[in-house]
Amino acid sequence: MSDPCWEQCVSCLQNELPSQQFNTWIRPLRVEESSTLLLRLIAPNRFVQDWVNDKYRTRIEEIISNSDAGPKSLEIAVAQRARAGFEVVRNAKVAPAVPVPDPLPSTGRDESSFQPPKGNTSADYSGHSDLGFQSPHRRQSPFSESQERFTQPLEMSRFGSGRPSNERSNEGAIGGSTESSADRERIPLQGVVEDLFKPTKNSNDFVEPRSTDPLLEIESRPIIETVSPRDIQDFGSQLTSRVKKKDVEGGIQHKHNLNTTFIFDNFVVGKSNQLGLAAASQVAENPGGAYNPLFIYGGVGLGKTHLMHAVGNALVQRKPGARVVYLHSERFVADMVKALQLNAISDFKRFYRSVDALLIDDIQFFAGKERSQEEFFHTFNALLEGGQQIILTCDKYPKEINGLEERLKSRFGWGLTVAIEPPELETRVAILKRKAESSRMPLPDDAAFFIAQRIRSNVRELEGALKRVIANAQFTQRSISVELVREALKDLLALQDRLVSIDNIQRVVAEYYKIKVSDLHSKRRSRSVARPRQVAMYLAKDLTHHSLPEIGDAFGGRDHTTVLHACRKIRDLQESDADIREDVKNLLRTLTT
């Protein structure tokens, strides 16, 4: 018989489970009785009945209790024609009582394969015109106080453990319920389990894994020859890593991994990062809004991770129960590989798609990893349509990431993309003063300016240099001065002096503009040579301690007024010409890193 409640449940499970699991365990179930109080399902044999009770019962009960038909009790029985015990009839064909529609044809737009179970959330759905992406399934932000977040009945901390767990839980869509009797005999099933999982010639339910992606081959490993119910339980227990302490709502456990020392209050703002700070502050105030996703890019050690953690900490402080997860992109890949190995990809999807905010650092690590990009693409779509905030960081503009799919690059630009530039002199001094104050070590202005003038590349190296100075002052019991800074950083300063000599500046500039070093010394005045020469003079004045006449002599014996004109010209062009500004920034990074 057909039942709308069961049809809805089947549709949800088909979206959540891998096709192999769905076709093997869910499709054979049929409805024998359905009323306002009871839903009675019939399994073709005892083997399927026990497996569904052990692995899927809690999830089925959750879906039917939230369905339009209202709460029902669930009963799963065995067909009368099946013998008692565990019998597997080879080549048996059990026609499903509930028709399962084939996947809809492509509409030309990439969609997430994950659909939240109907009734699990009271969120309203609306389009999202801010991102230029209209969807009838888009929910409001999960941080809205008027909205209830749905919880999943699966306990898990992370996908980190590949060892079988001895603990048994009564909850879980894949690994819940108490274990079957331990005294059941081991039953030879050689070839039988293979029949359960192996597609027939006429079946199109399974797709051959792409040979270009070795990760997919994990799913096609051989089936064990002899199994028992105890074996199956032990295997199922490996799918997820259990936690001893249950969540208050019995849902998935999310560890945020945030560094609580990275907050907005201790972020030093300057011209180079003020746009990034403003965007991050707006996201913290209105997560899931117009700035979703927020994509922050820039060089190493410039504060991208600090801003990301600051947003996460602000969200948790604002709503302590918020499911905020921070991780490096490498961790996402490792979790996915572990889920494939344990055949727990559905758990992986449920974990990452049930967060309120997902913060992923160094997204460029996905480059060249096709399977990881595929999974992240669907996770990205599911979170975005659910109104859940996404924050990503990268070391370069998304369009410049080689090995990243175009559909991901385009989606990264749906929200707001901001750049973090290397800090200017005043910001570097402010950072040094703030760090010295937190270390309770007075830092004179002249010493701070000396360090800031010599360390330009990034904040991380700046802080490292300050730590060396403070340690030297404490060990020698001296106050910090320019002389002490010279002593503490003498090896670093000597190396830097070698790297930023006029000769090295000329070589780097010539390579950057694809001209010869001799062209910089020549009398040629064509634009293709004159502009690089002016840039090289500007960098020599900015990075070295040579006088204007000395710099002029190094560029073919030019007058000091020519050098002064070049410095002023490049300084002015940086305000009006984005190309010159980008060239100077790239050359500074090359010369000072």
From Swiss-Prot:
Gene3D superfamilies: 1.10.1750.10, 1.10.8.60, 3.30.300.180, P-loop containing nucleotide triphosphate hydrolases (3.40.50.300). Domain I is involved in oligomerization and binding regulators, domain II is flexibile and of varying length in different bacteria, domain III forms the AAA+ region, while domain IV binds dsDNA. GO terms for molecular function: ATP binding; ATP hydrolysis activity; DNA replication origin binding; lipid binding. It is found in: Cytoplasm. This is Chromosomal replication initiator protein DnaA. Oligomerizes as a right-handed, spiral filament on DNA at oriC. InterPro entries: AAA+_ATPase, Chromosome_initiator_DnaA, Chromosome_initiator_DnaA-like, Chromosome_initiator_DnaA_CS, DnaA_C, DnaA_dom, DnaA_N_dom, DnaA_N_sf. SUPFAM superfamilies: P-loop containing nucleoside triphosphate hydrolases (SSF52540), TrpR-like (SSF48295). One of its GO terms (cellular component) is cytoplasm. Residues 1-71 are annotated as: Domain I, interacts with DnaA modulators. Residues 113-124 have a biased composition (Polar residues). It comes from Teredinibacter turnerae (strain ATCC 39867 / T7901). One of its GO terms (biological process) is regulation of DNA replication. Belongs to the DnaA family. SMART domains: AAA (SM00382), Bac_DnaA_C (SM00760). Plays an essential role in the initiation and regulation of chromosomal replication. ATP-DnaA binds to the origin of replication (oriC) to initiate formation of the DNA replication initiation complex once per cell cycle. Binds the DnaA box (a 9 base pair repeat at the origin) and separates the double-stranded (ds)DNA. Forms a right-handed helical filament on oriC DNA; dsDNA binds to the exterior of the filament while single-stranded (ss)DNA is stabiized in the filament's interior. It comes from the Bacteria.
